[in-house]
From Swiss-Prot:
Source organism of the structure: Trypanosoma brucei brucei (strain 927/4 GUTat10.1)
Single GO cellular component term: kinetoplast
Annotated GO biological process: lipoate biosynthetic process
Further details from the record: This protein may be expected to contain an N-terminal transit peptide but none has been predicted.
Alphabetized PANTHER family for the sequence: LIPOYL SYNTHASE, LIPOYL SYNTHASE, MITOCHONDRIAL
Spans annotated as Disordered: 21-41
Cofactor comment text: Binds 2 [4Fe-4S] clusters per subunit. One cluster is coordinated with 3 cysteines and an exchangeable S-adenosyl-L-methionine.
Subcellular location: Mitochondrion
Keyword Iron-sulfur: yes
Protein name (record): Lipoyl synthase, mitochondrial
Residues given in the record as [4Fe-4S] cluster 1 binding sites: 125, 130, 136, 375
Positions with a binding annotation for [4Fe-4S] cluster 2: 159, 163, 166
Keywords of this entry: 4Fe-4S, Iron, Iron-sulfur, Metal-binding, Mitochondrion, S-adenosyl-L-methionine, Transferase
Catalytic activity annotation: [[Fe-S] cluster scaffold protein carrying a second [4Fe-4S](2+) cluster] + N(6)-octanoyl-L-lysyl-[protein] + 2 oxidized [2Fe-2S]-[ferredoxin] + 2 S-adenosyl-L-methionine + 4 H(+) = [[Fe-S] cluster scaffold protein] + N(6)-[(R)-dihydrolipoyl]-L-lysyl-[protein] + 4 Fe(3+) + 2 hydrogen sulfide + 2 5'-deoxyadenosine + 2 L-methionine + 2 reduced [2Fe-2S]-[ferredoxin]
Length: 409
């Protein structure tokens, strides 16, 4: 916009300057005492007329507001640098994060990152450029009361499915599994020094068991090397084969997680055709039945994909009916141009509402917020929930003990 009106403004001035240049032959140009030519009169005339025209401009475009093509109701001080892409809205304030703290203030974060580089271990935290990496890896370094958490992705970096929200690379024939991966993962986790690890996986529909046996070997190796570690396995649906689900659920993990991702209506447009809403519910329900409620089950929902309020509420009900104990809700953000676009940015107040409703439905805990992801600060929430459960169990015994008669001396 600035170019259009500025060119229109300057065109008559340039024309006048060209006329002035023609009226002053080169031989008659004013010269100083040394014989050198003075600055061209054309430049002086141009600047004089340009300043005069700007000073007399009454269009209102000769201002900061006129110079910047701002979105409606956006003050100039909040303008983005550079042009906005057509159809792309600026991020709301609650999705703009602060730069993570430096090395001197986050020793846990830097230790984990250093070990990742040395072991050449892939994490979803870095691969997906998760905005919460400082909080999870730092684990409350500043306050000293948090739990460092990391998310490791096993079975390679290529997935056989093509969900439209995910940025993980897709391949029909991914590389074969690394038989040394269980040992390497266990060694790396031991060096990382975390208290809680989330082990996720790519879908491997090219394998007969979907990689279930490999996941069990990884879980077992990590727990044997790190017996005090809390381990959450965020796994796929294994083609809906419940025997494979039982195989993983029977391994020494602490939390069985499987994400339902979104509400039922939009699932065919969001997830790969081999995944389904009802199949995910069936997997989660079977884990709860197989372990007789002893296994903590967990799932996650994304907002901003075109869902309606009542649909989110129904999804929470379905998860709770399936016996899911923990749920997370977060804002979907488009990872690349080829992925689904964001339909809306849910306000933080809405996430607070869903957290309250989830807890009222009977979930043991709920992490709900714009930047929350399925493994967001998983260790901290898990530990707090365990402590809360212990306090609830111990409270009656203390009360009962207080009512017991004392032995006579």
């Amino acid at each position: 916009m600035f170019q259009r009106w500025s060119f229109a403004l300057c065109r008559p001035i340039v024309a006048a300057a060209q006329v002035s240049q023609q009226q002053v032959p080169p031989s008659e140009e004013p010269r100083n005492e040394s014989g050198a030519a003075n600055p061209p009169l054309v430049k002086e005339e141009f600047l004089r007329q340009f300043r005069e025209r700007l000073a007399n401009d009454k269009t209102g475009r000769n201002s900061l507001e006129g110079f910047l093509d701002l979105p409606e109701n956006l003050p100039p001080t909040a303008a983005s640098i550079g042009p906005l892409k057509r159809g792309k809205e600026p991020l709301p304030p609650w999705l703009k994060l602060k730069v993570p703290m430096g090395a001197s203030r986050q020793p846990r974060f830097n230790k984990i990152r250093r070990n990742m580089r040395e072991k050449r271990l892939a994490t979803v935290c870095e691969e997906a450029k998760c905005p919460n990496i400082g909080e999870c890896w730092g684990g409350g370094d500043e306050e000293g009361d948090g739990t460092a958490t990391a998310t490791i992705m096993v079975m390679g970096a290529h997935c056989t499915r093509g969900c439209r929200f995910c940025s993980v690379m897709t391949s029909r024939t991914p590389p074969p599994l690394d038989p040394e991966e269980p040992r390497k993962t266990a060694d790396a986790v031991a060096d990382m020094g975390v208290e809680y690890i989330v082990m996720t996986m790519v879908d491997r529909d090219d394998l007969a068991d979907g990689g279930a046996a490999h996941v069990v070997r990884c879980v077992t190796a990590v727990k044997e090397r790190n017996p005090g570690l809390l381990l959450e396995a965020l796994v796929g649906d294994f083609h809906g084969d419940l025997k494979l689900v039982e195989m993983v659920a029977g391994s020494p993990l602490n939390v069985y997680a499987h994400n339902i991702e979104c509400v039922e209506r939009i699932t065919p447009n969001v997830r790969d055709r081999r995944a389904s809403y009802r199949q995910s519910l069936k997997v989660l329900e079977h884990v709860n039945n197989f372990t007789k409620g002893a296994m903590l089950t967990k799932s996650s929902i994304m907002l901003g994909l075109g869902e309606k309020e009542e649909e989110v509420r129904q999804t929470l009900r379905d998860l709770r009916t399936a016996g899911v104990s923990a749920v997370t809700l977060g804002q979907y953000l488009q990872p690349s141009r080829t992925r689904l676009k964001v339909s809306r940015y849910a306000h933080p107040k809405e996430f607070e509402m869903w957290e309250k409703e989830a807890l009222d439905m009977g979930f043991l805990y709920c992490a709900s917020g714009p930047m929350v992801r399925s493994s967001y600060r998983a260790g901290e929430y898990y530990i707090k929930n365990i402590l809360k459960q212990r306090e609830t169990v111990e409270a009656p015994s203390v009360s009962d003990g207080g009512n017991e008669p004392k032995d006579s001396e």
